[in-house]
């Protein structure tokens, strides 16, 4: 893993390492408890979580409507795409697709300040934490997204648990180091 994330570009070794999930599955298999890695798809049924458990604002997704989740923050600074550049990504998305609904995921003082500003400037954006009461509701909403754009962060892994495709943006870490979300497509990594 250290060879893959080494800051010295000449010493980097680009080799896919097993994911954490694969490592755990191997341990359980050696203990006599094999795990079928294809068995788990989502914590919810194929149609997603029960939208009736969400505030009314989130209950009415039209069949042809696109819902995009954006989770631009992470616990570690090196994993965060620069805020102003992410704002430009969202602004471009809103300009090119004014009919899309954009849901901003994150909790904390910086997230609140940032997302309150973004929602004032871009009415298609909704700051999820202002309306959602708990993690279960966030997971239900995530299960109805068409895609989540996320850093290497908890939100990438949460979206993976509800079988939502994730476009993941990597900074200080690398998907080849085994950190990619469950069942996520390597082609969707940046």
Q: Model regions: which residues?
A:
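Catalytic machinery of carbohydrate-active enzymes
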Residues: 1-190
């Amino acid at each position: 893993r250290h060879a893959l994330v080494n800051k010295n570009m000449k010493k980097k070794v680009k080799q896919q390492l097993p994911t954490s999930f694969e490592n755990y599955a191997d341990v359980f298999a050696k203990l006599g408890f094999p795990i079928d890695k294809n068995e788990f798809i989502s914590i919810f049924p194929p149609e997603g979580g029960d939208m009736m458990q969400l505030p009314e604002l989130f209950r009415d997704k039209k069949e042809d409507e696109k819902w995009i989740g954006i989770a631009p923050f992470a616990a570690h600074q090196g994993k965060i795409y620069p805020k102003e550049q992410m704002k430009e990504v969202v602004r471009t998305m809103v300009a090119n697709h004014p009919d899309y609904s954009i849901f901003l995921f994150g909790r904390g003082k910086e997230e609140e300040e940032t997302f309150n500003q973004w929602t004032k400037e871009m009415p298609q954006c909704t700051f999820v934490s202002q309306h959602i009461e708990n993690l279960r509701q966030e997971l239900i909403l995530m299960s109805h997204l068409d895609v989540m754009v996320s850093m290497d962060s908890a939100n990438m892994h949460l979206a993976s648990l509800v079988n939502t495709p994730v476009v993941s943006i990597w900074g200080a870490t690398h998907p080849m180091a085994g950190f990619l979300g469950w069942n996520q497509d390597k082609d969707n990594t940046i």
